[in-house]
Amino acid sequence: MKRRFGRREFCIKSKSATFAVVYMADNTTKTTITPLEAAFIREHSGEDASKLLFRYSKESMEGFDVAFCVLQIESRNRLRAKLPCFAACEEFVFPPSINSSQTSGELSAQYKSSLLKGGETMVDLTCGLGVDAFFFAQKASRVCCCEKQDWLCKIAESNFKALKVDNCEFVSAACEDYLAQMEPCEVIYIDPSRRDENLARVYAVEDCSPNVVELQEQLLCKAPRVIIKLSPMSDLKSLCRDLQKVSDIHVVSVENECKEVLVELKRDYIGQLTFHAVNITKTNTDILSFNQETDETACEFVSSKEQIGRFIYEPNASLMKIGRFGRLVEKYDFKKLHPHSHLFTSDVPIEHFCGRSFEVEEIRKPNAKALKDIKKANIVVRNFPQSVKELRQQTKIKEGGEDYLFFTTLCGEEKVCLLCKRI
């Protein structure tokens, strides 16, 4: 259904209350929230946005814009978990269209700010909503925020005033144009758009806009250090091939879900590339670092089920993406089930493992007859010919519960099902 308020049109999917907000030709939008609007937003916080819009669509609301307020309520409902500091600020204005999939969450933005030494001068060439710039500003001495959309730049500047950030300046310009004429700084940060001209997702670094492969020399001329944020789907081998002077690649996961890949370029860097597997939780940040030469040579494999230890370990999403598991074996001294299974085992429990840990209760054959007594379990497939969906159809096991079933293949090509409990 559609509802019009002045020059704006809201398209609402009533089931999910998700907005696709289309601004008319003038592309004007509000940059501040009035006290009356703040009171309305506070009063209706957490309510269903589509119902609110329907309820107030026919009422004359003096002193504030109902559609704007509903947009703010919907944005806060949707992004409160990802951006708690911003959602909690009553004066913070969420723009009418925000690519929440590309916008950094606060936890990953805090990690990026930790990469700064402190006191640097910095330019964020793709400011957007300003999440990363906000956290960079807490470490850098000065941050220049460049945003090509003038209306979004004005919103970000107003929001930073509301957040009481006073060491940022804002420039409305295409990042390529600003890069050409900007003064040198110590660090440049860039998060190229991962949408093409038809708004379809792209993942290859050369398909993003701007194309940092083409800009990398110019970037390093303006700053000795460049940090590039890319898709979690980025191919790491391609990045190493297409980008020069790469010193570090950070694969960043939040709660074991891969969120982004950060590539660091350094102007005068000569040496081995270092990978950082990062998994951030609300209480802890696990980081395992290793150089490009680390490989599988140190791995010992399990050839039969009798060699499976009491415990099974599944590396976190960042480690799984990087894929160099020799460093894990070196650190934890355990065996791998198969070169392609990416599961590890030991007889001794490992504290603070960078991933999930399980205790093996039984080893069974991977068929319906051997599993007929199990009614509910979490099924995990690693290097196994059948999918989770196929196994559920075959075994009639429902999703959930405390049990985990790992369907996998050992180094001797024996297929097994490991009945485990998470520890």
Predicted feature locations:
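SAM-dependent transferase fold signal centered on methyltransferase-like domains
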Residues: 2-423
